[in-house]
Amino acid sequence: MFKFTCAALTKTGKKPVNRDNYMVGNLYVPQDHADLRNNAQGKTEQPFFVAAADGMGDEASGEKVSAETTEVGNKGNGSNDFNDNENPKRYQKKVIIAVICALLLVIGILVCILSKTSKKQLNFHDAAFEKAVREALNLADDEMLTTDILRIKELDLSGKKLSDISDIASFKKLTTLNISSNEISDISALENLTNLTELDWSSNKIGVINDEHVSVLRSLKNLQVLNLGYNNISDISALGSLKNLQVLNLDFNNISDISALENITNLQTLNLSSNNINDISALKKLTNLTELDWSDNKIGVINDEHVSLLRSLKNLQTLVMSSNEISNISALGDLTNLRSLDLSENSISDIRALGNLTNLRSLDLSGNKISDITTLKKLMSLQTLDLCYNNISDIGALKKLTNLQTLHLSGNSISRIFAIGNLTNLQTLSLGNNNISDISALKTLTNLTELDLADAMYGLTGNNINDISALGNLTNLQTLNLSGSKISDISALKNLTELTKLDWGYNNISDISTLENLTSLQTLELNHNSISGIRALGNQTNLQTLDLSDNEINNISALENLTSLQTLDLSDNKISDLRALENLTSLQTLDLNFNNIIDINALGNLTSLQTLDLSFNNVSDISALKNLTKLTKLNWGYNKVGIITDRDVSVLRGLTSMQELDLSGNNISDISALGNLTNLRSLDLNYNNISDISALGKLTNLRSLGLSGNNISNISALGNLTNLWSLSLSENSIIYINALNKLTDLQSLRLCFNNIGDISALTNLTNLWLLDLSGNDISDVGALENLSGLLLLYLDNNNLTKQKVEELCLKLPQAQIQSEWVDNDD
């Protein structure tokens, strides 16, 4: 940056300096510009100004240039004297130079002003928004300048529980903005973000797309990608004017009419999944459409009209129609341009129509009723095929599909897999839950990087593999799942040096010595076995994730050198001594529940821990945790704590990152000290001995609160917890629930087995999807008729008549209502 100053040059009548150019400040002035003579009297000084640029040399000080430092003129030489009136051109030059210098001075001042303005600190109007921005940009408490904001092109503010985003107007350079999973209905602040190309506004409970919303969206001339999923929208008529959109996501809404979309002819990708759409005639003009997701819309029957329309979409390459209760797909045989087709989770048994789709690269038929796959042999271009969970026993038709790279066959009745031996391009293969005993055919699949032989799930008979020597040839294998496979000898794997992930859980093994050679492992799952000794793990220094849960381990000293571990599950063992863990400073997640632990001092050095589960032990002193400032989740439930001391609270308050705390099952009666843990978002106090919950009124950031199984009768303190999403108050002594009428964000509420008779306070809780009122004294359920979002409602063991229950069922057709009624129909 240059700072401009001025130096005054005066006529003194002295002899010029012996050089052709005269230096003023740090600028050289040519002889003909500096040769200013005396006027007619030879005395009057006429200064003019020359801009000097700071930072260009040692002399760039911007000081006035005096006659002592700069001399111009030629004293006594009358022949060179001039009068301004006699030399107008020379005078004009002088004036022009002076004007230029003045302009440079003004520009310099403006640059300084603009520089200061551009560095102005940004002041936010909404604290929640500022906090969310700082978290997204990882700025903590640093000064945030306007210049910083203008450099930001992508911003993720998802899940910050925001409602006011007016401050977003300053982020004028944004091209990508994610405001999903908030409570934002007003987006007027986006109007000037004309560089925005992608906007994710999903999961905001919008309900209605109004004219104001569309006006803002239309102003975003460059907007190409819009996500409005999970918003309970039913009417999308206003979207028809957003003609520049190329990608539109409308999944998980209540849409049935999509006629407004016919004008958005630039659309290339459209997601309509999980709605109630049967008529797709509006799509016929969307000739640029390449991807269409029409899954989970309960279509039932694919009729000729559907197929005629889909055929007209000449550029359509990807079609998703999963979970639609479809049984007949004969009409789909004409969609010969398709490259990817998903028909999973339907009721399809006959797939002969697919034989014409020879351009298919990807086909998903999982979760159907298919037994005959002969027609698939025609689909020579297939690279990905999913046939999981059907009724297939013969896979001979697959042997010619040599382009396959991914093949999923789990959950069928396959016993012979010789056809797979020809598929040498396979990289991913799943064969779990079949009737396979011989896997020798796999030895030729040397390109395999991922193999799944997991078993004993979903109640199926399962494989019976004893010999896995064929796997010894698969030297590129990186991931192997043997969970529940009844394979106890894995010595054949000793040469698989690329193996980084092994799941050997649920196998009833006790000896793991064969693991000593697999030193490349990064993820190892040995859960639900009969392991007591783990010395073989001592050399597994590359391990990052280790699951040893549900075994017979009491000595964990072999783990002390596994310093790369980030996730460790030792739950449900017989461990009491934790000293081997004290050097595992990379640990982020540690599960120690259901052991014999009393002393946790060894955990004091694990400063990277974010999640710690100590439940079902005998830990009463948590002072060792005081330095674990990254801890966000602590489960200290069922440890016979009894009393929450000031020391405990002091430790917990020091854990400034902690958001989730579980103190359930601890026989606690006094929770007054917990009122200071104002950062908590989730608190579980179920099954204690609590009667006074007044201290909880301060925890206004709570989203989840569990108080079931206590002695609570007064819940007035809960009226302040307006951010709650989930509340459990079952098995208490509650009669009055008026305090709940302010908790309009509640989605899940459990009040079973209390003494509640009047439920009128619930009438405004329109966000509820789960409500449990069983085991109370309720006789009138009229207050529930407006809760149109209810999906699960439990009313057992109340004083309801059959008529009242039936009337409620008519009012809430979408809800599954579990109830019984008294014999009196009055």
What kind of region is each of these model predictions?
Residues M1-T69:
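N-terminal entry segment of metal-dependent catalytic domains or homologous docking segments
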Residues M1-V17, K119-K120, I187, L196, ...:
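Generic detector of contiguous secondary-structure segments
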Residues A67-T70, K75-T175, A189, T194, ...:
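N-terminal capping/linker segments that flank leucine-rich repeat
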Residues I149, S170-L174, N192-L196, L217-L223, ...:
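Leucine-rich repeat
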Residues E154-S163, K173, I179-E183, N195, ...:
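Concave beta-strand-loop units of leucine-rich repeat
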Residues I165-I168, I187-L190, I209-E212, L217, ...:
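Canonical leucine-rich repeat
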